[in-house]
């Protein structure tokens, strides 16, 4: 069974993927010290430095997972080459698990390990950075679960890409504006909408680290986690029943 795992690994991380990806993830943390002011991290600046698209490491990690899911696994489904893999001596559930580990979990581990070592090196492990890491983790697995679901459901690279980016973009943008409005009105509905875009709440939390805002962030992480798990098992059922 390990031989099949090696085949899948080489397919997804053949040269020069790792040689390019790992240095970019490491260099991406240059944006964090770029927000230094008077030799110290301003909390709100640290939050801005961790927002996806600004934080290059997070963006590259997510992009790699998207590429693996849609343009490797999804491509096999689109052109029918998945049949050759399913004819190997491996159960569908194990094949799905191997693919998920390589497509989603491994890029996340690259980010998590490098980010943790970086924060330890600059002595910045605190409640704010832990909150940022938890929020990104929950959002990452929710987002990749959405992409995986669309990839297996639509079985078209173009349609999966458009559906995934439209869904995630809409959630992130609407959630950003919505959460900002709810913060201003001090509404308890933040507990339900915080999962859509936690960064306005984290930014507000960096200015005023109150327990109420922290509770909203925790609620968002829990909702993201629940949705990610639900979509994961839904995708597993779709893959298990898929006819090739």
Model-derived features: where do they sit?
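Terminal transmembrane helical anchor/hairpin motif
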Residues: 35-48, 172-241
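Helix-loop-helix units of permease transmembrane domains in multi-pass membrane transporters
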Residues: 71-105
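Long, hydrophobic alpha-helical segments
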Residues: 49-75
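Central hydrophobic cores of alpha-helical transmembrane segments
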Residues: 21-28, 159-171, 189-195
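Aromatic- and glycine-rich beta-strand/loop motifs that create alpha-glucan
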Residues: 1-23, 241-244
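Membrane-interfacial helix-loop-helix connectors in multipass membrane proteins
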Residues: 40-43, 116-139
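A structural motif at transmembrane helix-loop-helix junctions in multipass membrane proteins
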Residues: 135-179
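Hydrophobic alpha-helical transmembrane segments that constitute the membrane-spanning cores
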Residues: 92-126
